[in-house]
Amino acid sequence: MVGILTGIKNRFLYNKLRKSLVGLTPYLAFDNTKEALQYYEEVFGACNITRTSPHSDLAESFGIDEAILSEKTVHSQFNILGKTLMAADNFQNEKTSCAECPVLLDLQGEEGREIEQAQEFWNKLVASNKVIVHAPFEKQFGGGRLGYFTDHYGVSWLLHVHP
């Protein structure tokens, strides 16, 4: 994945790839989304967080004890670096892996502010000691900067700024 993004030298192809991703929103599944949202708010600076618990009529169909409905999440939405993500509890109790399909936080660096914002975000992540860094956020041979890390929940992330 890293090679794909850093190897794109042709600006036309890069812009075409970016446009094809418009409208795609990562939808993550967790055992405890309420807890995960708190983590993303604390460590990633997530904002505009909304969370919906299931109604009592859904409790039976999801196999949830009505006493803990307020702890469960059927839908949530939040922003990280201006990018929208969604999440819900994994009601099927199936093992899921977010490691094989990284979430890309892709920022344009035309104004320079995006590079500063991404660097501040990266520094905060690393200082938290609550992520595992696989590749530092640094300049790439094809331009821009890229960093790769995994969070507490096993979600892999790419932070990319293209000049």
Give the positions of each predicted feature.
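Vicinal oxygen chelate
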Residues: 4-19, 50-51, 71, 79, ...
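Core segments of cupin and vicinal oxygen chelate
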Residues: 20, 28-83
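Short, solvent-exposed beta-strand edge segments and adjacent coil->beta transition regions
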Residues: 21-25, 98-104
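Conserved hydrophobic beta-strand within the GNAT/NAT acetyltransferase core sheet
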Residues: 24-28, 135
